[in-house]
UniProtKB/Swiss-Prot annotation:
Similarity section: Belongs to the IML1 family.
Keywords assigned by UniProt, alphabetized: Membrane, Vacuole
Location of the region described as Disordered in the Swiss-Prot/TrEMBL record: 31-52, 130-150, 724-801, 820-924, 1412-1467, 1772-1831
Cell location: Vacuole membrane
Protein's name in the database: Vacuolar membrane-associated protein iml1
Amino acid sequence: MSMRGSMRRSHLRQVSAASLDSVSSRSVDTAQHDALQLSDHPSSSDGKTYKFSSTGLDRRQCSLWVHDETFSKEEILFNQAAFADTGVRDGDLIEILSARTVVDGPSSGQSQSHSFNLAVKPDMRTRSMRDVHGHGHSHVETASSSRSHAMSKFKTPLQTRCLFIAKPLPNEIRTKHPKLELSVTSSVANIFGFKNRSTVYISIVEQTQCAASHVDISFRDQFLVRSDMWRLVMSELAGKIVYKGQKIVFMGSIKATVKNIFIRGKKVLSGFFSPQTIPVFRSESAKYVLFIQMSREMWDFDSEGTGDILFSRVINGFLPELFKRWANADARHLVTIVLFTRVEYDASITGLPSTLNSENLKNTSEPNHAPTRDFYRVVVNDMASGHWTTILDELKKDFRTFLRDVSILKVPEDPVASTSASTTPKATIGGRPSTALRGNILEAIHLASSHLAFDHIDRDMVHTGTSIIVITPGSGVFEVSYESLASTTEALTNRGIAIDLVCLSPMPLHSVPLFKYREPNRGGRSSFSYGGDIQGGGYSPEMRHPFASLTNRTHFSPKSTFSSTSPASGPRGPWTRANDWSYGIPHWLDISYWNPETYRESRRILKKDPNAPIPFTVTKKSKLFKSRVRMYEIQMGGVMESEQSNISIPYLLEDQITSRSLNVPPKTSFRRNSHFNHQLSDSLRPGSFLGNMTNPKETILSRSRSASATAAWMDNYDDNVFRSFSKRNHRRKQTKPKRPSEPEVQVSTTHDRLSARSITHLREHETKPNEWPRKEAAPKIPATKAVSPRKPALKAPSKTKVPRISRTISFALRGLGVAPPRAQASTEVNVEHATGLPSSNTKRSAGSLRESKSIESLSAASDSTSTATVVEASPMPSTPPRQRKSPTITPSRPISIRVPLKTPIEDSDQPTRSVAESFGTNGADLPITEKASLEHQTRKSIPRFELTTSPGLRESSAKNLQSRLLAPWVRSINPCNTPREVSRDTSWFGRWQHAYPRPPHVAVVKWKSLKSPAVLPLTTEEFPTASELASDYLQTPYRVFPNDDAEGIEAPKTTGLLMREMISLRLSHGFQIVVGNNVVEASGRYALRSPNVFDTQTLEMDGATVFLSKGHSIHRLVCTGGNEIEVTRFVHRSLSDLVSEKKNGLDIVYSLAMRTIMSREYDIKHINLRSSAEEYNWNYADNYIAGHRDYLFNPAQQLHFWRVRFVLIPVRLHVHARRHMQPINEDNEEEIHLLGINQLTLIWQRHKYVPPEEKRIETSSKSRDQNPLNILYQTRNPSEVVAAELNLLADPGLESSPAQLLPESELLERSSISLSSLAQIVQSDKGVRMMDRRWHWRLHYNCFIGSEFTTWLCQNFRDIETREEAVEFGNKLLELNLFQHVEQRHKFRDGNYFYQISSEYRVARPESRNSWFPQIRPDKSIPSTPATADNWKDSPLSAHSRSASVDQNAPQTPTTPSRSKSKASVMLSKTLKYDVDPRKRSNRPEVIDLHYDRLHNPDNCFHIELSWMNTTPKLIEDTVQSWAATAEKFGLKLVQVPIAEASAIDQTQPFRQPYRVKLKVPPPKGPSSTIFNAASFSQQDAPDPHYFQKLILKKFDFVLDFEARSAFPPDVEVGYSWGRPDYRYSQYIHQSGTLLVQITDEGDFLVLANRLVSTRTVPFTGTRDRDHRARAGYDPMGTIERDRLSPRLSPLVRPIHDIAGPASPMAHSSLDSASLYRAPEHVLHGFEEFCNDPVRLGQLYSESFVYPVSAKAAPTTASCVDSSIPSLELPAPVIGHHISPPPGTPVRPETRTRAASTSANGSLPLIDPRSRQREESSVARGSPRSASIML
């Protein structure tokens, strides 16, 4: 976080980028004096004083060796025997110092210990004593060449010393090397600059002296939850020595590196990790969302620098620098870039949509705001950071058209009509971007963080952390609404992310980043109400005293409130109370300022330019004045070229504000938060000036009336300005107050000059000097003739000639009004007037001014609410009306006069009464009597209060709900006078306070955060007081105890383990462990001491108490003595209100216009910005961890399990892959795919989680060798199988493995069984299942499956222990001709292979056994069917084959079950507990829920879903990688895909939406289905409405992923183990895994890129040459996987060669892809090109009727280049041998491969894959049977 203005005493904070931490801000003499004082007793970081160890080992000289890992794996070997005289013991902390460091160190007159252990004061902003000490004694590194480059930053012994803990030397090494004293590994020697056999000095040091305060730990290419970080620290770091560059390996899988170590704010090379050390984890593989605010200033020119527009700073400066730093750090981030802006429209545009104004979260401006709309343009989404050139190219292209696209308004704007070809909306340029000040920055941030609510779904397993960078052309000040600030703050706080804000404008003169907001006016405060309809511009005369009841909620100085009395605030008076500006600095926002010149110098330093500035030094500041504000109109008006160029220029916009108050009605004059009033850092340009005016026409008219009077008054003022005070005072007493506002300049200071307030007060009564005396007795004035309450109406323009100097000023500055620059008094004159005031009142006024840092340096009319709390605390007595009209009040402290609830009647008769009647100036122009009266009144009614923020004010302001919601996440401050002591408070940084080892600078770019964002720290000190905890929080206690009776559950068995798991769960959900004194004081009876959160033994003790916090929620966990854990949840009352509002549906709906990557135009979206108010049921979660799980129906959704989904996509099996599969070379491609799935199921079964108690009971290895997954393989889609063979899926026998049917006494033995008896047993009821089975077009009678027979042999043979033995015995039986393969192609195999009993052993049956059991039970629900032949009766499989011969005109028969009225239910997937840690590397069970398909079609995807609650993700990632490597050997690609369907992606990821592709030519009605279906007994299936769409998808290598819910029969309840299918459309996925496609009901395609695919890559085992890649076709993964494990993460992903093979449909388009990111676009390009080609579509439609094919999308086989291969037609006997084709079905030609059917012109494939495989088998084997029986 940035030091929002607190780093320097002055608020004029100009800090050079070279002011680094090592630069001293103190004198050397003072530092040396402090060093002498601290040398004897150095102090620790907590201020305590420690004495040095009295041990004898103090700077002992020894010889250091350097060894490698072959010598010893220990990093440091220390021989204690060589130092026996020193009393060194095991566990002592020893430091090693190079002899060179000691020699070059301090003089010998001082103790060496002093140089090693010098301490510093706790103030880390002052220079370290160690640095100063070394500086004063020439303690510099002279031999830098011998050190590494990193050593150049470490100058003192404390920073360069090497620490280690003494431990015994192994006996073997001690025996072999008795002379060894000290030895370090080569890696340690390189870090510290040690040389082999060199001399070093060792000393024993205290742990407190070398304990690290912070340790930066970086990691990449892995997803780590914060609970894993906590466990890593406890296991690998706590109580150990850490050093820079140290490699950390946790559980053999999680890898991290120590980047930086800090001791008392200084970087060191090594340190001790104490219980108070704070680990800071930083991710080098994060997801970055870069928001670029395209506000109006982006197109402004940089007049001070190169003259480019500000956007050039982004595209040519900041972003290239950022990408270069990423590349240098080898960071592998994913980048999303979004351009956003808020467009303001002119309300006068005819036909403006009435809903346009509601397209915002909340109106952030005044009541009469202009209609606005927020626009978002997604440039890139999740692109690898290494492709930065591509990112910049895309950004430049979008910038060219961005302004045009957002400025055009279509009237009327009808989304339906705009997309229609018949209606062309009228396009007009109706808007312009708003300024950065009034942009939609909070809405953009909230939108980006909204997807984190679904962070547990579709978890990316190789990236950790989300960082949001906002690049703005502004200076860090934003006007926002209170509601948006509160909701965004609450969302970011609960989700644990921080924002980096990069400003392109110079840093302003106040604290930043700053949010201006107006707190809402809640009910119940009638005196504060608007008094009228604000939105309608209502005005209530009763509320004309706006300052009477102010409430200080923002802890500003009273000075800031006085801005409300500016001339522009006159008509706004009634609403000033509710609309006073509040200023807040959020702790979740880090601000940086990009200065191109600074980083040009840094580049020169890196390039070793001799003229570059010296590093680590401060360049002497130039004394030349450097302007902070450029006034474009003054520069262009020729003022500076005139003879008066040495005079003061007019104040900014003073006349415009004053004049606009004259005649503008209250509704239109309420413009206090305009951009030109506030943002001083940006120069005013013509566009921005005119665009912010409410009504320029009114301003011009008002100026013409006041021109002459203004000039005359200024001339008179010039005559008086140099008169002595006494003369002027005497003159004023004589002539009465002719210039009531003239003395305003007397108390004006430099701060007032910043705000243009002085000149406006000087001119407020310039035309009516005697206005006030008449005003008191003035009669009622009609409201229609009301003039400004702040400035009375001016006379008509005088005919006297205006002085010449008045006409030399450009009218552009003030809206064509005169502005004589001579009117300004110099600063010296102002000071003179201020000191010349009478002492009676000057003391108070000047004193307040000296203390005040005027808030009006922000703006001329910026409002505040500073006097509110004081007024409420000390009510002022009511004064008579005449006293209330007193015109004189000190300008530095405006009086707040309380208005009685019952306003006097006479007050309501004065609607035009001037504010000056209540607030004037105390000057010499008033009578002495009035001044004395006012002074007395001021002293009596105004309490004295300080200008700084105090805890008392903070606490009092937090009494209202609005402040409590923001505090402490947004600090209310006075931005122009932020106290140093307030900003030094560690709580200033909120939840991120422990991420900063030292306070950051504002003026420099936070590269550390931008390069590697920090993860939310594990610990925090943010905690409420005991009283707040008791009064403001609701408590919910409950108890949790381990479930001792949990069977088969990986539940913790002890209270200590349960405690750790509960803490881990909360850490992974964004909680932080609370440490520090606050929690100790607030914990009451548990207040023993802050526990060591990194010590497991401490946490497991009885009575151990741990507090965890997250936003407004606090959890207290207490280990009780009764084997229980007491949990108390503290929820803030305001948060409970938010939860109740959320339940009532009060979430914010944000309407915006967004254009995603592939969209052609902006679409209106309505996004529900869900409140992150906590709804998580922690009671259920804790009990689930403890093992109580019976009460949860769907824990994965109820408890927000982490969930990821994978699919196994069948791809072409390459020839080279077959070489490594010699045993299965006889299998075809489809069989190999199923064999791969079978191999995975064997792995799953092998690593199935078995509780330890079950392992002890388990005695038989047979049960372990079983494979009970029982996946049913079918060649039809699941919906077809459900409709046709429901009884098969509902059969309970399929749910589990066949039971052991033979009793133990009747078990068989291989040596004593005969073939005939075995054949009888196998075919009996106790034998293996035999039934009729169909595969593709063929039906096989009375056969069994090899895998089931293998299981049967293991169960029923006493002497068969393993499945391998069963397969061996089965092959012997096959050789003996007991059974044979149905096609006689395979030996006996353990898989999905079909076998039949030989005819000589076959038992005759009256009917075919065609189900799992001998007969179907009469109570089973089956579809109603007509009577058929005996051979086909009751057989769903045979009936399915028979359906094609049924007459089309046959009467339709309902297919609903005839015996049951309730729906039948069927589960299409199963689940098991899988152990991802079989090697037991973790100290806890690592178990996940593995869901897999129960029914699978080998042509489709095989689905896998993983869910877990508290398991280590890195172990899951390693497991999935091993699965992917196994599947890749069998032609299966494991790809991660989103859980939700593609059409719903925008519900979880706001910056993505599917791309719609339409067919240029609507397809004709598809042919009737020719697939045999059991539901077609008496009817012909209706034509598939999406037949041709599926055909096109199959042509482009798409395979079926999930079917739509509507595809399943409505009378069947279909479910999965992970939930019910909810897909609206059927979804297909490309074989590369990069593209998802859905077919809508209208027949359109919804296309979405799968951005998760490239995180799931596996290095190939074999080498692939170019020919192989050509045959592989489109395989973008293959060419880069061998180069890097995760190409998506690589900053330099190599180009993809031959991305489209010759057989691929995209082969005809030239492809020059540079990254995997482009792969989906190339697939989409060819796909969309085909859909838009009428000729190719027509050819496809016509050919499909000649040769109808199955519309089922299926994979292709090996590619074939030649399209001239003649299509081979299967002979009729081959087909007729199995089944006759249905009547009327044309003979379909077959080809050798699918790819051969794709001709060069993209004609349709002419082959059904099932027939293709039969033909392949016939050619290859020469068998008369051509059908391929799978596995």
